[in-house]
């Protein structure tokens, strides 16, 4: 809002003088009411800050404070339009914001007086047209001009306004000077009264006098500025700086005339430093003629003073001045720099004078701020001065030391002073100060920024939000904390996770296991009376049971002879098991006797019950489980489906015997299985991988194997195969050695049997119906078909099956070899209208379980599966098994076909063979013969053809067993590692690996034969001999490889023999001096010499050919392929030059190896490279120009 009595008219005529006069009276009247108005000093100046007609300017200049009224920089200084406003404007704006907040925290009386005085001073000088450039910067209280000097200066700067304006201006100046004298006298009176008080207030009075001297010291500079202003260019004479007037509008006790004429200066001994500084300023303000003579040296000092640093030469006066001008020292120094830089028309002397005037104005500000009529202002200032007196003294000393060195750049000193002002200001109004975020950001990033300034800015904003650099260095740690993780850390994490699955090895000697009982079987009397012949006859009747072992119990005929409990017998009768099957009648007595058993029986013969019933008796004999104890019975299976089926077979007995069982397999949530194990379970049916996870989970606190005494490996041949054997053995090693182990399977290859026996103790082997034999109840059909006719034949078989009403509820199981084939066949059958589903290892476990259940329940009659469903799957209505893709070995075929014809039922197994699968026909024909069925003629032809190829060495007989899948890459890596070790650690005694060497030689021979054939074809096409090949060397000829000569072990010790051999060597060397024929080495008789060697002379070949056989890349390839050693020896001799006696032979290559074949292959490859290099050299020579265009003369 506008002030009382003010007019908003920008016209300088008629209204300004009256407005300023009313403003002075109104300001005195409303001083108290406006004391608490924090915005009055900004809002009240807005009317006068509009465009005004200047006395000597014909254009309007934009007042920046209209757009930025809150910018205190604009309130304190006004920059002419000819000034550069690029960089300094932003800096002043930022500091103006700080000043705005500092003013809010000042004493309210002082602020009101400052606003009043500035308003009055501005209104008195608003329309002055004859003020010089410097007088515009200084207000009436700092110019120190008397009325006489004003009148003298007016003619020098004629005013474009009317003569009435001159009279008004003179009257205003006279009143202002009288008011200033009155204020100075009042202040001096108060100082004398305070000095008379004495006592503890004397110290504070000393500080006030020092600060009060600063205007007196600075006042002589103003009259000196007047003659300098007279010499300024005309456009600056009639202008003034309204910002400077606003800033200096506080009632100034300084005199308008020369120092000492109107103001009584207090005499103090401590003012000597200030007086010396005053003398320096007076000397600096000499007329331009005098200043120009020493402008270079004076410029440094004056710049220092111009930036508010001239006071630093005055130690004591500056201490008090810095305290009183707490919030303005930084801004003043910045503002003076901004005013001096953009005045190119001015000379150095004028700039220096302006800088000195700025220092005077800065000092006068101190007096205006401190000089007042109210006691509380002085008390607050004195208290602040008393608190900081000691600190300011030390800073003043540092400032003096810096002042001694000349500062070529005033900006640097300005930063120091601004920091000093900020550091002092922090004690008074740290909570109110605000640092511009851009300044804080730049000060943090700039390495050349003074650290004190940055520290002060951060400390001054301690109670406010700290300015944060969004892309500063402090964020680098957060950004790179994860990304800069070392590879070792990740490897450590991976190893740690890997170690979690490792089961710690158990030292059974240190463990204390509870004793347990294995033997529960008591042979019935009728069986005990049976002779061995009768027992053998009984075994023959029971499907030809074959047993092997010591003290094998006789087979039982009824369940009552097995020594089972009443609860178990009740469940057996409830399940409808009338009599034991063949495998059950022999295996149950053997297991109940506490013996380790290997049971091999046909599919569907009841092997699961054969090991479950003895286990229940075994568990019931031991004490119940306590908290955190593991199972007693452990059953491991290769597939998840088989584990689920065994667990399902246990359930009828568990409830009757009050036992608990847990089925643990991969694919299912492990948390549920952990919860069940923690509740306690006597039986665990699991797959090996998931069991290892459970044993390693929670540092082994989930479960343990300390109480396991009964272990079953179902489908044992698969468990000891390449895929499961390491995991199974790891688990078995953690179980007590005196456990009882039972192995069951429908197939048991001989190599698997030998491996399994290592885990057993004096086992009894029971074989029912032969190993790997298809049950006779299964009808086997094998057809040889092309790939494109298999699907049509499958549709025909399914149509014939379901055409009979008796087979309406029949199931059909179709086996394929790959997961993709299962999904493809499923899609094709669904298109033909057959409801079916697929199951394979790529599906989720929940899908696999639900599919098996739906298939058993008859929801869909056809199931397409891989071999994952070949073992243990028991579906009673399954009447048809189709091997859409032939199994790759005998055991897989037996298990696939055994899914049908179970428990005495009949079934059909159809197998499709293609011409490319004759390798598999051998096992299928063998299964047909063992089961007593005729082998079809097309299948027999395929078998004969394959066996002939095996005899001829073109094919390799397939081994029995699964052997693992997808391990070819691992085999290759293992073989390569073994070969590298052999080459690295050669001993010359690797005679046992002849097969590997032959295989390697054959592969190398095939590889190089192709290369040689291409080279030979190229050579045959050429009718002329290859150009560039030396005479006597045939690259396509036979390669001669020699065995390395070794000194005999028992060399003769006769000196004459040694002399004779030496002479022979000399003669031989002389006879072949300089001649390096192929196959004649010179120096390969060292201890590292290979068993075979060959040489190839390359001296006379073209350079490209020599490079082809000696560069590192080609040689490395040959070394890797052949395992030989290739060395370049001899010296190169130009064409036509032969080596003399005793000289090195011509350049040649020595190839050494452990076998003749390897050396031959390496030599063949080197010759090929030589030929290619020679051809390339001849081709390049043919393309080369005959002569150049220029000759060197």
Curated annotation (Swiss-Prot):
- In this entry, which stretches build a coiled coil? none
Q: Binding positions for ATP?
A: 601-608
Q: Residues annotated as region Disordered?
A: 1-236, 326-426, 957-1009
Pfam families, per this entry? DEAD, Helicase_C, KH_12
Please cite one Gene Ontology biological process associated with this protein. RNA splicing
Q: Which InterPro entries match?
A: DEAD/DEAH_box_helicase_dom, Helicase_ATP-bd, Helicase_C-like, P-loop_NTPase, PRP5/DDX46/KHDC4_KH, RNA-helicase_DEAD-box_CS, RNA_helicase_DEAD_Q_motif
Positions of the Helicase C-terminal domain: 793-943
Recorded catalytic activity of this chain's protein: ATP + H2O = ADP + phosphate + H(+)
Motif DEAD box extends across: 714-717
State the protein's purpose: ATP-dependent RNA helicase involved spliceosome assembly and in nuclear splicing. Catalyzes an ATP-dependent conformational change of U2 snRNP. Bridges U1 and U2 snRNPs and enables stable U2 snRNP association with intron RNA.
- Name the protein family: Belongs to the DEAD box helicase family. DDX46/PRP5 subfamily.
Could you identify this protein by its name? Pre-mRNA-processing ATP-dependent RNA helicase prp5
Name its species: Neosartorya fischeri (strain ATCC 1020 / DSM 3700 / CBS 544.65 / FGSC A1164 / JCM 1740 / NRRL 181 / WB 181)
Q: Which gene encodes it?
A: prp5
């Amino acid at each position: 809002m506008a002030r009382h009595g003010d007019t908003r008219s920008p016209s300088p005529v008629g209204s300004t003088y009256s407005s300023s006069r009313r403003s002075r009276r109104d300001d005195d009247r409303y001083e108290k009411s406006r004391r608490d108005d924090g915005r009055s000093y900004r809002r009240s100046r807005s009317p006068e800050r509009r465009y005004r007609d200047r006395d000597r300017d014909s254009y309007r200049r934009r007042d920046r404070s209209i757009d930025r009224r809150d910018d205190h920089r604009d309130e304190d200084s006004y920059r002419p339009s000819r000034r550069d406003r690029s960089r300094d404007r932003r800096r002043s704006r930022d500091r103006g914001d700080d000043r705005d907040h500092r003013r809010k925290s000042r004493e309210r009386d002082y602020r009101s007086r400052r606003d009043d005085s500035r308003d009055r001073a501005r209104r008195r000088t608003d329309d002055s047209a004859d003020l010089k450039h410097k007088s515009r910067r200084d207000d009436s209280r700092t110019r120190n001009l008397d009325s006489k000097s004003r009148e003298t200066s007016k003619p020098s700067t004629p005013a474009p306004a009317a003569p009435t304006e001159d009279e008004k201006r003179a009257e205003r100046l006279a009143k202002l000077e009288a008011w200033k004298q009155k204020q100075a006298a009042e202040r001096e009176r108060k100082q004398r009264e305070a000095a008379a008080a004495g006592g503890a207030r004397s110290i504070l009075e000393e500080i006030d006098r020092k600060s009060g001297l600063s205007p007196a010291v600075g006042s002589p500079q103003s009259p000196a500025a007047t003659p300098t202003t007279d010499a300024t260019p005309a456009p600056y004479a009639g202008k003034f700086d309204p910002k400077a007037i606003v800033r200096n509008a506080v009632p100034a006790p300084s005199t308008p005339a020369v120092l000492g004429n109107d103001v009584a200066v207090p005499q103090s001994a401590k003012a000597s430093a200030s007086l010396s500084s005053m003398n320096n300023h007076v000397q600096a303000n000499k007329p331009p003629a005098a200043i120009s003579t020493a402008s270079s040296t004076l410029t440094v000092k004056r710049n220092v003073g111009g930036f508010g640093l001239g006071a630093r030469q005055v130690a004591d006066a500056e201490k008090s001045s810095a305290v009183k001008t707490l919030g303005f020292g930084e801004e003043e120094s910045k503002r003076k720099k901004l005013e001096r830089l953009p005045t190119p028309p001015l000379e150095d002397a004028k700039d220096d004078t302006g800088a000195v005037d700025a220092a005077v104005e800065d000092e006068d500000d101190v007096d205006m701020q401190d000089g007042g009529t109210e006691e509380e202002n002085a008390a607050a200032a004195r208290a602040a001065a008393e608190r900081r007196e000691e600190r300011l003294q030390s800073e003043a000393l540092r400032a003096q030391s810096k002042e001694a060195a000349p500062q070529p750049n005033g900006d640097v000193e300005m930063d120091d002073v601004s920091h000093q002002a900020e550091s002092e200001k922090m004690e008074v109004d740290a909570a109110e100060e605000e640092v511009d975020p851009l300044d804080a950001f730049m000060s943090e990033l700039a390495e050349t920024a003074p650290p004190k300034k940055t520290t002060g800015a951060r400390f001054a904003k301690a109670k406010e939000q700290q300015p944060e650099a969004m892309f500063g260095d402090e964020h680098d740690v957060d950004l790179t904390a994860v990304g800069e993780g070392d590879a070792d850390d990740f490897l450590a994490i991976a190893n740690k996770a890997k170690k979690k699955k490792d089961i710690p090895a158990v030292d059974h000697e240190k463990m204390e296991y509870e004793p347990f009982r294995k033997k529960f079987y008591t042979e019935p009397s009728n069986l005990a009376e049976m002779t061995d012949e009768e027992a053998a006859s009984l075994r023959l009747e029971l499907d030809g049971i074959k047993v092997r072992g010591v003290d094998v119990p006789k087979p039982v005929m009824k369940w009552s002879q097995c020594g089972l409990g009443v609860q178990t017998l009740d469940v057996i009768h409830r399940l409808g098991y009338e009599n034991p099957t063949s495998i059950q009648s022999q295996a149950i007595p053997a297991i109940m006797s506490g013996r380790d058993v290997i049971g091999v029986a046909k599919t569907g013969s009841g092997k699961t019950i054969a090991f479950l019933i003895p286990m229940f008796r075994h568990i019931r004999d031991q004490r119940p489980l306590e908290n955190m104890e593991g199972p007693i019975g452990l059953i491991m299976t290769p597939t998840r489906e088989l584990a689920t089926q065994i667990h399902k077979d246990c359930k009828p007995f568990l409830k009757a015997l009050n036992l608990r069982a847990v089925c643990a397999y991969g694919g299912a949530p492990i948390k549920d299985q952990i919860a069940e194990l923690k509740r306690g379970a006597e039986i665990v049916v699991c797959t090996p991988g998931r069991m290892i996870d459970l044993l390693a989970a929670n540092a082994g606190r989930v479960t343990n194997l300390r109480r396991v005494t009964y272990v079953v490996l179902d489908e044992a041949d698969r468990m000891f195969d390449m895929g499961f054997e390491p995991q199974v053995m790891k688990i078995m090693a953690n179980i007590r050695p005196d456990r009882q182990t039972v192995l069951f399977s429908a197939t048991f290859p001989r190599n698997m049997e030998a491996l399994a026996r290592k885990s057993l103790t004096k086992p009894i082997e029971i074989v029912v119906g032969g190993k790997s034999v298809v049950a006779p109840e299964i009808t086997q059909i094998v057809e040889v078909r092309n790939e494109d006719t298999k699907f049509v034949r499958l549709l025909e078989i399914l149509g014939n099956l379901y055409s009979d009403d008796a087979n309406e509820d029949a199931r059909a199981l179709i086996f394929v070899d790959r997961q993709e084939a299962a999904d493809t066949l499923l899609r094709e059958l669904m298109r033909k209208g057959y409801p079916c589903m697929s199951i394979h290892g790529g599906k989720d476990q929940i899908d696999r379980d639900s599919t098996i259940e739906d298939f058993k329940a008859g929801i869909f009659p056809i199931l397409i599966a891989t071999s994952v469903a070949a073992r243990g799957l028991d579906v009673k209505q399954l009447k048809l098994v189709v091997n859409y893709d032939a199994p790759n070995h005998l055991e897989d075929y037996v298990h696939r076909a055994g899914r049908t014809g179970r428990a005495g039922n009949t079934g059909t197994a159809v197998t499709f063979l293609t011409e490319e699968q004759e390798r598999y026909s051998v096992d299928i024909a063998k299964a047909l013969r063992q089961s007593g069925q005729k082998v079809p003629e097309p299948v027999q032809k395929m078998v004969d053809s394959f066996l002939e190829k095996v005899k001829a060495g073109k094919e390799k007989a397939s081994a029995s067993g699964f052997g693992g899948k997808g391990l070819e890459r691992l085999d290759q890596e293992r073989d390569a590692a073994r070969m590298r070790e052999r080459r690295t650690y050669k001993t010359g005694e690797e005679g046992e690996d002849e097969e590997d060497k032959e295989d390697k030689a054959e592969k190398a021979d095939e590889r190089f034969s192709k290369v040689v054939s291409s080279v030979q074809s190229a050579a045959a096409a050429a009718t002329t001999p290859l150009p560039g090949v030396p005479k006597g060397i045939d690259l396509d000829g036979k390669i001669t490889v020699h065995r390395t000569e070794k000194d005999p072990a028992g060399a003769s010790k006769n000196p004459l023999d040694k002399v004779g051999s030496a002479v022979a060597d000399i003669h031989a060397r002389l006879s072949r001096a300089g001649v390096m024929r192929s196959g004649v080495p010179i120096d390969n008789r060292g201890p590292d010499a290979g068993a075979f060697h060959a040489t190839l002379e390359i001296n006379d070949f073209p350079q490209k050919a020599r490079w082809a056989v000696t560069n590192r890349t080609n040689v490395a390839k040959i070394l890797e392929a052949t395992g030989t050693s290739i060395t370049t020896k001899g010296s190169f001799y130009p064409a036509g030059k032969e080596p003399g006696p005793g000289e090195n032979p011509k350049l040649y290559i020595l190839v050494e190896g452990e076998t003749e074949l390897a050396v031959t292959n390496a030599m063949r490859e080197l010759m090929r490279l030589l030929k290619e290099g020679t051809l390339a050299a001849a081709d390049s020579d043919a393309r080369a120009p005959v002569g150049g265009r220029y000759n060197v003369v």
